[in-house]
Amino acid sequence: MITNSFTNNFQFIKDTGILKDFPLSVKRILVFQTVNFLLEPPNGNTQFIVTSKEHLQWIMEITEQGFLLPIEDSQIILQCIELYKKWLFDPKHKPTPLIDDDDEYFHKKIIEHLTLIFQPRSYPHYISMSNNNSNNNSNNSNININNNNNNNNNNNNNNNNNNNNNNNNNSNNTNSGSNNKESSNNNSPILSSSNSGSGSSLSLNKDKEGGGSNSGSFLGVNQQSSPPPQQISATTTAATSPTTPTTPIKDTLQQQFLQQEVGGFNEVVQQQQQQQQQQQQQQQQQQQQQQQQQSPSITTGTVKGSKYRESVMPGSSMMVQSSTTALYSSNNYSGNVQLPNISVKELIDSHSVLCQKVLQIYLEMSRGTYSRSFSTDTLEHWNRLMLSITDCILGIHSNSDEMLARNLCPLLLKTLFEVWLQSKTLNPTLWNSLTKYAQGWFHHMPTVNQWNLTCLALTTPLVQSIYTNDHQSKSTITIRLDETSIEFEKEYLYYAWNRILNLIGNPNQIKSPAIFSEAITGIFHLVSMFLSVTNDGNAILHIFGSWIFEAVKTIKPGFDEGISLGSEILLHIFLSCSRKIEFLPIYLSCFYTCISEALWCDGKILRDTIIHSQNIFSSGLPGSRILIPSYIRALNHILTAQGTNDPELRRCAIKILGSILCLPNRYETVKFHNFFPGRTIDPYPPLPNDIIDGKHNELTLPPNEINTYDDLKPHLAYLILSALNTEMSSSNLLTLIWYIMFYQLEYQHQHVKPYPDGKLITSSFIHQSINTILKKCSSFTNQWSHDVILSSFQLLSDLASQHQRIPNFLENASTVVRKLCKFITFKCKETNMSPETEDLISLGCSTIADWVVVSPWIFEGNYLTDTSTFYMVFNALSVAMGAKSPNDIISSNASISSSVSNTGISSIGGGGSSGSGNSSQPSSTGSGSGGVDSGSKSNSSSSSSSQPSSTGGSGNNSNSANGGSFKRPKPYINNNISPKVKEVAQCALKAIMSKISYFPNPYNATPTNTSSKVTESDIITQIKAKAEKHLGIKNFPSEQSLRFYAIGDSIIITVIDQPFTSTSSSPSDSYVTLIIRDMSGKSVINSQLAFLPFKQREISEIQQPITNEKESQIDDGDDSVPTNTTATTIDNTISNNNTTTTSNNSIKSTSNNKVPIKKRSQYNCNEEPFISSYIENVEDFGDLSSYIEKHIDENFTKLIDNQMEVEKQKLFANKYSLTPSITTHPPVLKTSFNGDCKLQQARILLTHLGFLNQENRNKLTPLENSVQFFQSLNMLDSVSERVQIKIPIIYVKKGDSTEDDIYNNVTSNTTQDYQDFIASLGWLVPISTHTGFLGDLDKKNLTHGQFTPYYATHSREMVFFVSTMMPNSDIANNSSQEHKKKLINKTNVSVIWFNGSIEVYEKTLLETFPHAIQIVITPLENDLFRLKTLRKATHSNRMKTGPVNDEIIISKHILANVIRLSVVNSNQSLLNLSSGDGKTQHIYTNRKKLISDITESFKHDMTIQKFYEFHFEPLDQSQLYQNTENLPMANNFKFVKTSSVNLFRKDRTQSALIGTFTLPPPPISPTISPQPSPHLSSSGGSWASSKGGSTQPTTPSGRTSNFLSRRPNLSQSEDQSHK
């Protein structure tokens, strides 16, 4: 029973309604014949048949009765519908009275008659259920049908009482009046059947079907234009549950119905005969089914072979019949013909199709001219009829069939809203009634769908009219519905939008979760429409806020979908508008309460809240950090779960975790508001025991309640560690592992307080993080992917740079190095090594080198008692270079040592394998005392032998027993190791050997250079200057002092004889300068012979001048005695100086009578010089004296006396040529530089080193001196041994839209945070005097400014191109911006400082710059910064690097450090991408290859004789060294050996062409306000001195040898300082 309907039983004209008392068969024949005739009139025109209003009135009354026929007569009803359709839309068939219908009477009657088809019907009970296939084809819906005589008892599970069913059916089939007899004769439409499967009776109330109506419509319409509402009764089953929305029937169904017409009853009779033959079988089957089936509902079906078919309309669940049997014809018809068996479902589908045909006519009328030509009264009357129809079909208390309602609902509602909006009614009564009755329709899903579509159609022009200028000048606005458009005035649009929006009432009152979710979805679309044109979040919340807040705050079981949508809407509103408006406090309070409630839920509510609130802490929303405790609970629930299949949820959770990491360091003791005092955070699952390693490394347990920010620190640590152990997505792991670095950087700050127990914040965390990474990376089960392991190794390499602030660094470093060594040793055992494995081993070797090089920790601590780490390093690197692990051959080495000791022979194991089968072959490696054997490798495990060892390899044990001799095998080489791995291992070993604890080096060198800048030309100039100073020789041939050699193919050495020092020209002070060029750079070393300990030379000690070699011929014998010339020289020296000082020995003597001569070998050179003394001769010469006395010759005596007197006088005059100290003087020092060959000390040095021995002849190769060779050396010096990176820094103000706007910014117009950031990037150096890497900055004209930030470590150099520090005027080109663009756009990675939101930059400015990777920095409040790495689409999937992999919020004090690391790693990823196969070479490898090319191209092959003569002969004039810095390279020059290094490539030294597998650690990053480096000069902030822009050399204490630094003209400045 429909209550409060808008229908009324009208009083009809007395002259009408005569057909109401006719039998059904008569009415059927009359309607059929009349309508069929009018559809196809003889003359083809209806206007000549229906000429008067009376005729039209009579025909319409007949047609009205056609609409009231039973549904079984659907073909006749369809013809009636087609007749009205022709009259309405076909002018040719439109009757004349209908054309002249000025008062629209007949049009109203047509609309009313069409509504009769929607009258609830009772469907007959003769249903064929015997066909099982029909049951399968049906929609398996159970239909409970009641008849018109209140057969409720039969519906209440009276399924087993067939007698009662039959009685009820008989009573139902009873008809009143004259129809009783006819109904008893016509058994076909009143078949009584008891369905065994349904258990309920189905009957047709003939009185209700055939006689009931003398009304103009099923609503009862009279002639009045505005009938009052009155309820109408109808008897059908009420709808019990909502169904899936359906789509309207297409116009093609009409053709299907018409095609099924037949000519007479012949077909009917044939069908009846076939059915009668099967009737008995069907009845038996029905009885069996009744016993088997216990369901109280009816399963509908069709008769086997029937013409009725079921089809599913596209996009709809509605089942419609494809054809209807033509039961009647114009030639033969009998009311006694038995109708075929028809299922209820087919009848309902037929009814649905008829109703849909009517609704299509209504739509066509509303979209055509009728809606514009009808009067307001007619339109409102039409609206009332549509409202009544809709409520009758869809209302809560409706008696219409549920399936019929489900089939008609979508098209019915669409028609209602279109007709209603086309009418443009302002009648408040109608609108109020629509609002009232619509509340009873929302239990149908299509109702919500149609409401959503209508609201969205009205909202689109509404927001454009209010917030844009599109409709400002228009008086009307076009509303675009599904298939039509309507012109509205603005005022009516606003009125209709508000009315339609509030039809739904409060969506939270909807009882169905699915419909509630659909309603919230519609609200979401409306809110999104508003947000697309306005940022006024308060206005949007005024409209929708109450609905959404209630939906989210009231958590109802089963409504998760709608609640999650409500949470998404709130987050969408607040996060998108937070930076543009201030929300009202009441809205903020409600928002935080709702989101907090959602975060304490599980399932879809929590998932959607996390996903859509990932940017909540970077949005600038006031007070958003009050939600942190709730987010911690949610992150605990998500990140600690094992094996989740929702990587997107975990990605957003990890992003939120990154937004919280920095906050405890900023707000330590600030308290939180507790939304839910009774709720506590669930305890974290325990971490694996193998990552803790002792109680002292256990993390502090997080508290159950979070009261302050300090309480967050252990929670964050546990979340990171737990997520590392549970995360399965590689993409998420690439972001998560870098949180270890952020946590370490944030909490290693000096102002961070330790825990109450005294432990540092990061001590336990960093230890367990390292253990977790190493456990996952070295796992044999491949728990992490290849990309994740590579990124993890990069992280470990970068952590080494923080060694000074990592707690327990020695322990952590030992753990990292030991486990990586085991990892490398294990991976090198693979027989078929994949490229991924090669990358892992290479990066592992480089990571080991980084941890070893940063400090001498490997030699500290317990090194004296535990050397396992030390040996493991070289074991792993040797295995990576192709050697065999000593652990694998220790047994064979032990047996070899024992056998060798028995024969008196021992050898150092060269890695040979006892089981290799090659041990019987002798090695060709030569040996010699003092020789250099670069190819031999000694095994540390064989060092236990106490006997002298010789170069060789361990061989088979049987060799020692064969004749007492031992044959050395060939060295073991692992052929499975790729050349790439070997090269990287060699480079790592070279870095350890040459760079350990060597940056910055201890010789007052600056971070600018790690290689010497001294060249051969500088030293030649120094020698010439000293020769002119000491000897007065101009143009001293110092070029003869140079010789170039190659040691193997990896080292180029230059030996230079230095005959003079800066203060002396004594031969004893001469020395040799060695310039060594290898893969690690260039080193300059001075070597000097020393026979006594060096002492600090005083300034007053002046060397004795070199004596002319021709005037000082001194015998070098042991008993030498000075000659006269020598005595004169010595005498002159004594008379002038009284003391003679030599370079190495000071010889003193005292005067006596006699000087006994003593051999030199009797004296110790360390003792004081010997002292001679005169001793009296007491020998007896008596006989000779007496003889002389007897034979005295006076003359002779006189002569003797005179001679003696003269001598006496002479001696007296010369003081007898005697002094108190008389000694034998040593040989006078000689010089060997007077000849043409100046190579003297260098030859001695090479001899002592064993290079000139015949055994080592092939180790040292002289190189040809030529201009091309000297130019190649200059090119080699220009190849840096460190990675060189150019980093552009671009400042973008809010509002900048073009490149010119951006590049016009200068430092003075920037913010203080930006200036602090620039200051913290590196050291500010002057461009004109800087000696380090500058990229393409102009040093000559200073086009790019005078200063630039520079930063360097032991493995890389960085120069920053700061756009705001560059002038805006280019003098050379007279261009204001072009010089900046050319410089900055050359790089692939840039850093963008944007004073706005990242989302705005990504939408508007990302494509402004050509860089493939852009790291964007946006400042937040309280010294916090939001960072995000934006990648161009062409590279986004292959360039995920850290630390800023996706998005993070960090503090100010770590900003510069994070940016440097991110740029370095991003450059490395681009290098890997540009190399094609993803394999880039180590930076050392480029130098090594170039050295090999130079050696092969310029080696000088000599015979043995020529080789030795080469060291004594002077060079030809063409072979003398030339300074070729300014000479162009010959275009036709090519290396003999093919090389991958392009000698003529100008930009070869840039970072884009030099890759590295390592990410070496920089020194401690500068603070926010960096202090000047101690090496900076006061003039420009550079390490350059005021004289020449170089570093002043100093000699370390305790050394006399001068380690030449990087400055030319070194000794000249020293000489000037002594003047």
UniProtKB/Swiss-Prot annotation:
InterPro entries: RALGAPB (IPR039930), Rap/Ran-GAP_sf (IPR035974), Rap/Ran_GAP_dom (IPR000331), RGPA/RALGAPB_N (IPR046859). GO terms for molecular function: GTPase activator activity. Residues 1273-1494 form the Rap-GAP domain. Keywords: Coiled coil, GTPase activation. The keyword Coiled coil applies. Residues 265-295 form a coiled coil. It comes from Dictyostelium discoideum (Social amoeba). GO terms for biological process: regulation of macropinocytosis; regulation of small GTPase mediated signal transduction; small GTPase-mediated signal transduction. SUPFAM superfamilies: Rap/Ran-GAP (SSF111347). Residues 1559-1573 have a biased composition (Pro residues). Residues 1591-1619 have a biased composition (Polar residues). Residues 128-249, 289-316, 907-974, 1134-1153, 1554-1619 are annotated as: Disordered. One of its GO terms (cellular component) is macropinocytic cup. This is Rap-GAP domain-containing protein DDB_G0281809. Residues 130-204, 231-249, 916-926, 934-965, 1574-1590 have a biased composition (Low complexity). Pfam families: RALGAPB_N, Rap_GAP. The keyword Coiled coil applies.
